[in-house]
Protein backbone atom coordinates (compact mmCIF):
# COMPACT_ATOMS: atom_id res chain seq x y z
CA UNK A 1 0.00 0.00 0.00
CA UNK A 2 2.82 2.36 0.89
CA UNK A 3 4.60 1.59 -2.35
CA UNK A 4 1.43 2.36 -4.25
CA UNK A 5 0.97 5.66 -2.42
CA UNK A 6 4.57 6.77 -3.08
CA UNK A 7 4.67 5.65 -6.70
CA UNK A 8 5.27 8.47 -9.14
CA UNK A 9 2.77 8.95 -11.96
CA UNK A 10 3.97 7.44 -15.22
CA UNK A 11 5.56 9.88 -17.64
CA UNK A 12 3.29 10.36 -20.61
CA UNK A 13 6.10 10.38 -23.16
CA UNK A 14 3.75 9.31 -25.92
CA UNK A 15 2.13 12.77 -25.85
CA UNK A 16 5.39 14.33 -27.03
CA UNK A 17 5.81 11.61 -29.66
CA UNK A 18 2.42 12.30 -31.20
CA UNK A 19 2.78 16.09 -30.98
CA UNK A 20 6.31 16.24 -32.38
CA UNK A 21 5.42 15.79 -36.11
CA UNK A 22 2.71 18.45 -35.97
CA UNK A 23 4.94 20.86 -34.04
CA UNK A 24 7.79 20.29 -36.50
CA UNK A 25 5.61 20.89 -39.56
CA UNK A 26 4.02 23.99 -38.01
CA UNK A 27 7.43 25.36 -37.06
CA UNK A 28 8.85 24.85 -40.55
CA UNK A 29 5.81 26.24 -42.36
CA UNK A 30 4.76 29.07 -40.02
CA UNK A 31 7.30 30.00 -37.34
CA UNK A 32 10.51 29.92 -39.42
CA UNK A 33 9.05 31.99 -42.32
CA UNK A 34 7.58 34.44 -39.81
CA UNK A 35 10.92 35.16 -38.18
CA UNK A 36 12.58 35.19 -41.59
CA UNK A 37 10.14 37.86 -42.75
CA UNK A 38 10.69 39.93 -39.62
CA UNK A 39 14.45 39.66 -40.14
CA UNK A 40 14.26 40.74 -43.79
CA UNK A 41 12.38 43.90 -42.79
CA UNK A 42 15.54 45.16 -41.03
CA UNK A 43 17.74 44.86 -44.12
CA UNK A 44 17.91 46.59 -47.48
CA UNK A 45 19.79 46.07 -50.70
CA UNK A 46 22.89 48.21 -51.06
CA UNK A 47 25.86 48.35 -53.39
CA UNK A 48 27.59 45.56 -51.50
CA UNK A 49 24.47 43.42 -51.14
CA UNK A 50 22.20 43.15 -48.14
CA UNK A 51 23.02 45.54 -45.31
CA UNK A 52 21.43 46.00 -41.91
CA UNK A 53 19.27 49.13 -41.97
CA UNK A 54 17.49 49.01 -38.63
CA UNK A 55 14.14 50.76 -38.83
CA UNK A 56 14.88 52.58 -42.09
CA UNK A 57 12.38 50.49 -44.04
CA UNK A 58 9.66 51.36 -41.55
CA UNK A 59 10.60 55.04 -41.75
CA UNK A 60 10.33 54.82 -45.53
CA UNK A 61 6.95 53.11 -45.34
CA UNK A 62 5.47 55.70 -43.00
CA UNK A 63 7.56 58.75 -43.89
CA UNK A 64 8.02 58.67 -47.65
CA UNK A 65 5.06 60.33 -49.38
CA UNK A 66 4.78 57.72 -52.12
CA UNK A 67 4.96 54.73 -49.81
CA UNK A 68 2.83 56.17 -47.02
CA UNK A 69 0.03 57.22 -49.39
CA UNK A 70 -0.23 53.70 -50.80
CA UNK A 71 -0.04 52.11 -47.35
CA UNK A 72 -2.72 54.27 -45.74
CA UNK A 73 -4.99 53.82 -48.75
CA UNK A 74 -4.62 50.03 -48.50
CA UNK A 75 -5.15 50.09 -44.72
CA UNK A 76 -8.28 52.24 -45.03
CA UNK A 77 -9.68 49.92 -47.69
CA UNK A 78 -8.88 46.92 -45.51
CA UNK A 79 -10.73 48.47 -42.59
CA UNK A 80 -13.79 49.10 -44.77
CA UNK A 81 -13.55 45.52 -46.06
CA UNK A 82 -13.62 44.32 -42.43
CA UNK A 83 -16.48 46.63 -41.44
CA UNK A 84 -18.68 45.29 -44.24
CA UNK A 85 -18.08 41.73 -43.08
CA UNK A 86 -18.90 42.65 -39.49
CA UNK A 87 -22.06 44.59 -40.40
CA UNK A 88 -23.36 42.29 -43.14
CA UNK A 89 -21.84 38.81 -42.98
CA UNK A 90 -22.01 38.15 -39.24
CA UNK A 91 -25.56 39.49 -38.64
CA UNK A 92 -26.82 37.49 -41.62
CA UNK A 93 -25.02 34.43 -40.28
CA UNK A 94 -26.72 34.88 -36.89
CA UNK A 95 -30.12 35.32 -38.55
CA UNK A 96 -29.71 32.23 -40.70
CA UNK A 97 -28.53 30.17 -37.74
CA UNK A 98 -31.53 31.28 -35.68
CA UNK A 99 -33.91 30.29 -38.49
CA UNK A 100 -32.22 26.95 -39.15
CA UNK A 101 -32.21 26.05 -35.45
CA UNK A 102 -36.01 26.02 -35.48
CA UNK A 103 -36.97 22.31 -35.34
CA UNK A 104 -40.23 23.06 -37.16
CA UNK A 105 -38.42 24.28 -40.30
CA UNK A 106 -38.66 21.75 -43.12
CA UNK A 107 -35.64 20.94 -45.33
CA UNK A 108 -33.33 22.78 -42.95
CA UNK A 109 -30.50 20.33 -43.69
CA UNK A 110 -30.75 21.17 -47.40
CA UNK A 111 -30.76 24.91 -46.65
CA UNK A 112 -27.77 24.57 -44.35
CA UNK A 113 -25.81 22.65 -46.97
CA UNK A 114 -26.63 25.06 -49.80
CA UNK A 115 -25.63 28.09 -47.72
CA UNK A 116 -22.35 26.54 -46.61
CA UNK A 117 -21.45 25.17 -50.07
CA UNK A 118 -19.85 28.41 -51.45
CA UNK A 119 -17.33 28.27 -48.59
CA UNK A 120 -15.88 25.13 -50.15
CA UNK A 121 -15.26 26.80 -53.51
CA UNK A 122 -11.88 28.30 -54.36
CA UNK A 123 -11.35 32.04 -54.58
CA UNK A 124 -10.54 31.72 -58.28
CA UNK A 125 -13.87 30.07 -59.08
CA UNK A 126 -15.88 32.54 -57.00
CA UNK A 127 -14.00 35.56 -58.34
CA UNK A 128 -14.36 34.67 -62.01
CA UNK A 129 -18.01 33.63 -61.69
CA UNK A 130 -19.00 36.90 -60.04
CA UNK A 131 -16.85 38.90 -62.43
CA UNK A 132 -18.78 37.33 -65.31
CA UNK A 133 -22.14 37.84 -63.59
CA UNK A 134 -21.49 41.54 -62.92
CA UNK A 135 -19.98 42.30 -66.33
CA UNK A 136 -21.97 45.06 -68.11
CA UNK A 137 -21.14 43.47 -71.50
CA UNK A 138 -21.77 39.73 -71.18
CA UNK A 139 -22.95 39.38 -67.58
CA UNK A 140 -26.37 38.11 -66.57
CA UNK A 141 -26.92 40.73 -63.86
CA UNK A 142 -28.38 43.36 -66.28
CA UNK A 143 -30.84 40.83 -67.69
CA UNK A 144 -31.88 39.58 -64.26
CA UNK A 145 -32.55 43.11 -63.04
CA UNK A 146 -34.38 43.89 -66.27
CA UNK A 147 -36.62 40.84 -65.74
CA UNK A 148 -37.87 42.26 -62.44
CA UNK A 149 -38.04 45.85 -63.67
CA UNK A 150 -34.93 47.11 -61.87
CA UNK A 151 -32.50 47.45 -64.76
CA UNK A 152 -32.09 51.15 -63.99
CA UNK A 153 -30.30 50.14 -60.78
CA UNK A 154 -27.56 48.29 -62.63
CA UNK A 155 -24.15 49.91 -62.90
CA UNK A 156 -20.64 48.64 -63.65
CA UNK A 157 -20.02 48.25 -59.95
CA UNK A 158 -16.58 46.70 -60.35
CA UNK A 159 -15.53 49.56 -62.61
CA UNK A 160 -16.53 52.47 -60.37
CA UNK A 161 -14.21 53.61 -57.61
CA UNK A 162 -17.08 54.36 -55.24
CA UNK A 163 -18.61 50.87 -55.48
CA UNK A 164 -15.82 48.47 -56.42
CA UNK A 165 -14.51 47.66 -52.94
CA UNK A 166 -17.99 47.28 -51.46
CA UNK A 167 -18.95 44.97 -54.33
CA UNK A 168 -15.91 42.75 -53.81
CA UNK A 169 -16.59 42.68 -50.06
CA UNK A 170 -20.20 41.61 -50.64
CA UNK A 171 -18.99 38.81 -52.91
CA UNK A 172 -16.73 37.70 -50.06
CA UNK A 173 -19.71 37.87 -47.70
CA UNK A 174 -21.70 35.63 -50.05
CA UNK A 175 -18.87 33.10 -50.09
CA UNK A 176 -18.17 32.94 -46.35
CA UNK A 177 -21.49 33.64 -44.64
CA UNK A 178 -21.77 29.90 -44.09
CA UNK A 179 -18.95 29.90 -41.54
CA UNK A 180 -20.59 32.20 -38.93
CA UNK A 181 -23.91 30.49 -39.67
CA UNK A 182 -22.51 27.05 -38.79
CA UNK A 183 -20.67 28.25 -35.68
CA UNK A 184 -23.71 30.09 -34.34
CA UNK A 185 -25.93 27.14 -35.26
CA UNK A 186 -23.71 24.81 -33.23
CA UNK A 187 -23.71 27.26 -30.31
CA UNK A 188 -27.51 27.47 -30.35
CA UNK A 189 -27.82 23.69 -30.32
CA UNK A 190 -25.45 23.48 -27.34
CA UNK A 191 -27.75 25.57 -25.12
CA UNK A 192 -29.19 23.21 -22.46
CA UNK A 193 -32.85 22.34 -22.89
CA UNK A 194 -33.42 23.09 -19.20
CA UNK A 195 -32.62 26.76 -19.78
CA UNK A 196 -35.06 27.04 -22.69
CA UNK A 197 -37.77 25.15 -20.80
CA UNK A 198 -37.37 27.48 -17.83
CA UNK A 199 -37.67 30.47 -20.16
CA UNK A 200 -40.85 29.04 -21.67
CA UNK A 201 -42.30 28.54 -18.21
CA UNK A 202 -41.70 32.24 -17.59
CA UNK A 203 -43.51 33.09 -20.83
CA UNK A 204 -40.39 33.95 -22.83
CA UNK A 205 -40.77 32.44 -26.29
CA UNK A 206 -40.07 33.20 -29.95
CA UNK A 207 -38.06 36.29 -30.79
CA UNK A 208 -38.06 37.45 -27.19
CA UNK A 209 -36.44 34.17 -26.13
CA UNK A 210 -33.69 34.64 -28.70
CA UNK A 211 -32.86 38.18 -27.60
CA UNK A 212 -33.11 37.62 -23.84
CA UNK A 213 -31.85 34.04 -23.46
CA UNK A 214 -30.06 32.68 -26.51
CA UNK A 215 -28.15 35.76 -27.66
CA UNK A 216 -26.36 36.38 -24.33
CA UNK A 217 -25.38 32.71 -24.20
CA UNK A 218 -23.82 32.72 -27.67
CA UNK A 219 -21.87 35.96 -27.20
CA UNK A 220 -18.56 34.08 -26.69
CA UNK A 221 -19.09 32.36 -30.05
CA UNK A 222 -19.88 35.69 -31.68
CA UNK A 223 -16.63 37.04 -30.24
CA UNK A 224 -14.67 34.15 -31.74
CA UNK A 225 -16.35 34.74 -35.10
CA UNK A 226 -15.46 38.43 -34.92
CA UNK A 227 -11.76 37.78 -34.30
CA UNK A 228 -11.68 35.12 -37.03
CA UNK A 229 -13.27 37.66 -39.38
CA UNK A 230 -10.68 40.25 -38.38
CA UNK A 231 -7.75 37.91 -38.99
CA UNK A 232 -9.19 36.62 -42.26
CA UNK A 233 -9.97 40.07 -43.65
CA UNK A 234 -6.56 41.53 -42.85
CA UNK A 235 -4.97 38.51 -44.55
CA UNK A 236 -7.26 38.79 -47.57
CA UNK A 237 -5.71 38.77 -51.03
CA UNK A 238 -7.03 36.03 -53.32
CA UNK A 239 -10.51 37.34 -54.10
CA UNK A 240 -9.38 40.91 -54.80
CA UNK A 241 -6.53 39.64 -56.97
CA UNK A 242 -8.89 37.38 -58.93
CA UNK A 243 -11.58 39.99 -59.52
CA UNK A 244 -9.54 43.20 -59.83
CA UNK A 245 -5.97 42.11 -60.55
CA UNK A 246 -2.74 42.99 -58.78
CA UNK A 247 -3.31 46.71 -59.39
CA UNK A 248 -6.59 46.45 -57.45
CA UNK A 249 -8.43 48.76 -59.80
CA UNK A 250 -10.00 51.00 -60.61
CA UNK A 251 -7.27 53.43 -59.56
CA UNK A 252 -6.32 51.31 -56.49
CA UNK A 253 -9.87 51.63 -55.15
CA UNK A 254 -9.85 47.97 -54.07
CA UNK A 255 -6.22 47.91 -52.95
CA UNK A 256 -5.86 46.21 -49.57
CA UNK A 257 -2.79 45.27 -47.57
CA UNK A 258 -2.55 41.87 -49.24
CA UNK A 259 -2.42 43.24 -52.80
CA UNK A 260 -0.11 46.07 -51.72
CA UNK A 261 2.23 43.48 -50.20
CA UNK A 262 2.11 41.34 -53.35
CA UNK A 263 3.04 44.21 -55.69
CA UNK A 264 5.81 45.38 -53.40
CA UNK A 265 7.37 41.98 -52.73
CA UNK A 266 7.14 40.38 -56.17
CA UNK A 267 6.79 43.44 -58.40
CA UNK A 268 4.23 43.95 -61.13
CA UNK A 269 4.54 45.25 -64.69
CA UNK A 270 7.08 48.11 -64.50
CA UNK A 271 7.36 48.00 -60.71
CA UNK A 272 10.44 46.10 -59.57
CA UNK A 273 9.95 43.80 -56.60
CA UNK A 274 11.53 44.74 -53.28
CA UNK A 275 11.46 41.77 -50.86
CA UNK A 276 12.76 43.88 -47.99
CA UNK A 277 10.02 46.51 -48.25
CA UNK A 278 7.53 43.71 -48.84
CA UNK A 279 8.70 42.09 -45.61
CA UNK A 280 8.27 45.43 -43.87
CA UNK A 281 4.64 45.60 -45.00
CA UNK A 282 4.12 41.98 -43.92
CA UNK A 283 5.59 42.80 -40.50
CA UNK A 284 3.20 45.71 -40.08
CA UNK A 285 0.30 43.44 -41.07
CA UNK A 286 1.44 40.94 -38.46
CA UNK A 287 1.57 43.63 -35.78
CA UNK A 288 -1.92 44.87 -36.70
CA UNK A 289 -3.37 41.36 -36.50
CA UNK A 290 -1.46 40.59 -33.29
CA UNK A 291 -2.77 43.78 -31.68
CA UNK A 292 -6.36 42.97 -32.63
CA UNK A 293 -6.10 39.42 -31.31
CA UNK A 294 -4.52 40.57 -28.03
CA UNK A 295 -7.23 43.19 -27.50
CA UNK A 296 -9.85 40.49 -27.95
CA UNK A 297 -8.13 37.93 -25.70
CA UNK A 298 -7.22 40.22 -22.82
CA UNK A 299 -10.11 42.72 -22.79
CA UNK A 300 -13.17 41.39 -24.59
CA UNK A 301 -13.04 37.66 -23.93
CA UNK A 302 -12.54 38.10 -20.19
CA UNK A 303 -15.80 40.06 -20.01
CA UNK A 304 -17.68 37.34 -21.91
CA UNK A 305 -16.75 34.49 -19.57
CA UNK A 306 -19.68 35.19 -17.31
CA UNK A 307 -22.00 34.03 -20.09
CA UNK A 308 -20.33 30.64 -20.38
CA UNK A 309 -21.53 27.56 -18.58
Task: Annotate each PLM feature.
Residues 1-5:
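Gram-positive cell-envelope targeting signals
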Residues 7-309:
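A structural signal for multi-pass alpha-helical bundles of membrane permease subunits
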Amino acid sequence: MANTMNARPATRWYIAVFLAPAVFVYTMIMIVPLFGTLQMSFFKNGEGGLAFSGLDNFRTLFGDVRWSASFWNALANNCWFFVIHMLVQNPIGILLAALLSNPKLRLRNAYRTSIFLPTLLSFVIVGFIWKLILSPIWGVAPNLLDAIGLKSLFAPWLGKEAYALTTVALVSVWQFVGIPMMLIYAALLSIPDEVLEAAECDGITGVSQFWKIKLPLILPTIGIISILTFVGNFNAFDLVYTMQGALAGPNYATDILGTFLYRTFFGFQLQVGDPNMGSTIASVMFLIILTGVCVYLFFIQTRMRRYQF
